[in-house]
Amino acid sequence: MENKWTDRTALLLGEDKMSRLSNAHVLVVGVGGVGAYAAELLCRAGVGELTIIDADTVNTTNINRQLPATHSTVGRLKTEVLAERLRDINPEIRLHELPMYVEAPLLSPQGGKLQSEQEDENEFSRDVITPSALLDKLSNVPEMSSPHGGNVGGRLFIVDAIDTIAPKCALLGEALRRGIPIVSSMGAGAKSDITQIRFADLWDTYHCGLAKAVRTRLKKEGLRRSLPVVFSTEQADRRAVITVEGEQNKKSTAGTISYMPAVFGCYLAEYVIRKL
C-alpha cells in the first residue's frame, strides 16, 4: 500500500478529525512573520482549503524571521511565494491567494461609510479591501459559502496575523459581529523569551501594547466579547523599539528574533486544528 503524506497525522488525530480538517476553510490574514508559519502548519496538518491575504512584498529586513523571505524572493509577493510552498506540500489544496491589504472602512464625519467606499468595497480588483467586503465576497463564492447559508459563519475559521491596529480591529470587530470563529496574534516584537508565550482571552492579557490598543478600540465599539489570542507575558525591551516616519499605519519598528513569530504561528495553528 502506498504511503500518504498525511498518514502520520492521521495516526495521531484519527480519520474523523482528518475529515473535518479536509473539509475546513481557514482564512489567514497577514502572511508575514506569524501568519505564514500558521498557514504552512495548517496546510501540513491537512486543512483542505486556505485563503491567504497580504499585499506585501518580501523585503530584505524580513529575512531574519519570515517564512517566505530569502534573498532569492526579495521583491516578490509574500502570498505568491507562500502559495508555491503550500501547493508543493499539498498539490490538492484548495488555495486562494489575495494580494491585497485589509483596511478599516473609511468613515464620514457623521460616522457612516463614504460613498466611494460603499460603491467599491465589494471589488476584489482593488489592492485594498475592508473586512466586511472580504467576508461578503467569501460567502458569495459557492465553494467558500457556509452550508447554513448567509454569511460564512459555518466552516470558515479566521487567523488574524495583522500587525497594525486599525485594520486588525476592523477584522476582529467584523468577525465578532458575524459570529465567525477567529483567533488573533498579539505582539511578538521586542520580545525574546519563548517560555512566556501564552494563550488567553484578549481581556486577560498584559504586558502587550498591541493587545492594550486592541482592547481599547473594541471596547469603544461595544465589542467586549471573548476573543482567543496568543500573546507574551514578557515586557517588551524598549531599547529594541525605534520610531519610523512615512509608513502607513505604523509609528514604530521593533526588533525581532527568528523564533518568536514562528512560535506564535505554531500556537495559532494548534488552536485552529484543535477547534475544528
PLM-predicted stretches and their roles:
Residues 99-106:
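Conserved SAM/SAH-binding loop
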Residues 44-49:
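Conserved S-adenosyl-L-methionine
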Residues 2, 153-154, 164-167, 182, ...:
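Glycine-rich phosphate/adenylate-binding loop
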Residues 111-112, 149-150:
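Glycine-biased, low-complexity coil/linker segments
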Residues 34:
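Hydrophobic/small residue at the entry helix of a nucleotide-binding pocket
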Residues 106-107, 130-138:
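Short amphipathic alpha-helix with an adjacent loop that forms part of the alpha/beta core around
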Residues 54-89:
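Glycine-rich phosphate-binding loop and adjoining beta1-alpha1-beta2 segment
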Residues 1-26, 60:
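N-terminal charged helix/coil linker that caps or initiates catalytic domains
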